[in-house]
Amino acid sequence: MAYPLQLGLQDATSPIMEELTSFHDHTLMIVFLISTLVLYIISLMLTTKLTHTSTMDAQEIETIWTILPAIILIMIALPSLRVLYMMDEINNPALTVKTMGHQWYWSYEYTDYEDLSFDSYMVNTTDLKPGDLRLLEVDNRVVLPMELPIRMLISSEDVLHSWAVPSLGLKTDAIPGRLNQATVSSSRPGLFYGQCSEICGSNHSFMPIVLEMVPLKYFEAWSASM
C-alpha cells in the first residue's frame, strides 16, 4: 500500500514484484554510475584549459566507447528479458478469473464456478466507513486464494482500460476484442489496491481495484456463500 511522501516502490507481495524491484535497483545503479562518470568528465572539461591533442581522433578510445555501451545495454537487457518471460509464464493455474473493463467499473467472472460473477463499483465518498480509503474502496472485492497461481483474463467492453495492482507487479491492458492474460500470486494475505491505469474517459479516476487475498479455506467458504 502506498503512503504519503513515499519515494520508493510499494512493498512487494508477489514473486514478480520482487523481481521487478530487484531489476529496478539493478538498472538504477547502472544509471547512477553512468551519470556520475558523465558529470565528472563535464567538470573536468569545465575546470581545465589543457587539451590532449593525441586523443582527439584516437582509434582506441573510439573502440572503447563503442564496446562499453553495448556491454552496459546487455547487462540491462538480460535481466529485463528474464522478468518479461516470468511475467508471461502461466503454468497450471489453480483458478481463472475473467476481468472486463467498462466505463467506469470492473466486472469479474470466476470461470471455474457456475454463476459466480459480479460487478465492482467504487464506493461513494459519502458512504465510506471510518478507516476506508477515499477513491479506492469498492462494493465488491475480488477474493482470491493466496500462494496459488491465478490466471487473470483481461478485456474490455468499450474503450481501452488497464488493470493494475502495483504491489503485485500487475499492469495489463484491457483492449476491446482482445483477451490478455496475467498471473496473480500473493505471498501473504491482505487487501491490495489498484486503479485503472489507462485514461478512459471522464470518470477514469473512479475505477478502483481491490484484491482480497485469503487462505484457501477462507476462499472456499466465500465461494460457497456466493
UniProtKB/Swiss-Prot annotation:
Compartments in which it is found: Mitochondrion inner membrane
Modified-residue entries (Phosphotyrosine), positions: Y218
Mitochondrial intermembrane side: 1-14, 88-226
Record EC number: 7.1.1.9
UniProt binding sites for Cu cation A1: H161, C196, C200, M207
KW Acetylation (keyword) present: no
Broad class of enzyme this protein falls into: translocase
Entry binding sites for Cu cation A2: C196, E198, C200, H204
GO BP terms in the entry: ATP synthesis coupled electron transport
Pfam short name (any one): COX2_TM
Catalytic activity: 4 Fe(II)-[cytochrome c] + O2 + 8 H(+)(in) = 4 Fe(III)-[cytochrome c] + 2 H2O + 4 H(+)(out)
Mitochondrial matrix side: 46-59
Membrane topology: Multi-pass membrane protein
Chain segments annotated as transmembrane: 15-45, 60-87
SUPFAM superfamilies assigned: Cupredoxins, Cytochrome c oxidase subunit II-like, transmembrane region
PANTHER family, per database record: CYTOCHROME C OXIDASE SUBUNIT 2 (PTHR22888:SF9), CYTOCHROME C OXIDASE, SUBUNIT II (PTHR22888)
Subunit composition and interactions: Component of the cytochrome c oxidase (complex IV, CIV), a multisubunit enzyme composed of 14 subunits. The complex is composed of a catalytic core of 3 subunits MT-CO1, MT-CO2 and MT-CO3, encoded in the mitochondrial DNA, and 11 supernumerary subunits COX4I, COX5A, COX5B, COX6A, COX6B, COX6C, COX7A, COX7B, COX7C, COX8 and NDUFA4, which are encoded in the nuclear genome.
Name under which the protein is recorded: Cytochrome c oxidase subunit 2
Species: Perognathus flavus (Silky pocket mouse)
Gene (name only): MT-CO2
